[in-house]
Design a protein with these regions (language model features):
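Hydrophobic alpha-helical segments, chiefly the membrane-spanning helices
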Residues: 1-241
Length: 241
């Protein structure tokens, strides 16, 4: 069940990213913005669903561990694995996005120091996420204004159906994922926090890892850096909030 649910999460997220990218390209958005938004959201969706389900199951330690572990995995596992393959050109990285990520990490650390996140603190984190979305929207408008002509490309309706079905499979897979992870924790007498910061965090980071490796192989460094930065920001502000 554990392995099967991981495969469901991986392949469904892969479809979301693949076809989401095709839609975004047809709108004339840069690769970095694509990585920062659609691809980051698609690869962060497993963490989102896992954390929401963990909250419903009253397992806050899984939420904390999942967000922290996933962000560590994105940097220590995903980014380092890509760097081992080739030199990563980060010239296109938005410095403001990087600063925003660091600031959001500090805020998340401060609000979670007591081991709990209140509703007010959740509102603060979500407010930061909405401000982040507003900034991205402004950047998209600026980019489109700077492009003299954008060739419009129609995308078929079946792509929307594939994405919706992929989201459904993702939700189902994450449900099985949490249940099997908790069963493993009970069987080996391991705390749910340890399980969430290791197996669940790495498992939900598989879409980021796969997408980033493919981006590096194709020398799409903007997609790689945008994906990692955007995914980490969403993990902190959207998922934890």
């Amino acid at each position: 069940q554990f392995l099967g649910s991981m495969l469901m999460i991986y392949f469904s997220a892969d479809f979301i990213v693949r076809y989401g990218k095709e839609i975004a390209i047809s709108l004339g958005i840069s690769k970095y913005i694509i990585g920062l938004t659609l691809i980051a959201f698609g690869t962060s969706f497993p963490e989102f669903v896992v954390s929401i389900n963990a909250s419903i199951m009253n397992e806050p330690s899984i939420v904390f561990g999942n967000v922290i572990g996933s962000n560590i995995a994105n940097i220590a596992l995903v980014l380092s694995a890509c760097a081992l393959i080739t030199h990563i050109n980060s010239d296109k990285v938005g410095k403001q996005d990087l600063i925003f990520f660091l600031l959001s990490s500090v805020v998340a650390f401060l609000v979670s120091m007591d081991g709990n996140i209140s509703q007010l603190e959740g509102v603060i984190l979500l407010s930061g996420f909405f401000f982040y979305c507003y900034r991205i929207k402004k950047n998209i408008i600026i980019e489109k204004n700077n492009i003299e002509s954008v060739k419009e490309k129609r995308f078929d309706f079946y792509i929307i159906i594939i994405i919706v079905c992929s989201f459904f499979i993702l939700v189902t897979g994450s449900n099985v994922f949490i249940s099997s992870a908790l069963s493993l924790a009970e069987r080996f007498n391991v705390s749910s926090l340890v399980i969430s910061t290791t197996m669940i965090a790495i498992g939900t980071s598989l879409p980021e890892l796969a997408t980033s490796l493919i981006a590096v192989i194709n020398k799409e460094y903007e997609l790689l850096t945008g994906n990692i930065i955007g995914s980490n920001i969403m993990n902190i502000l959207m998922i934890m909030g």
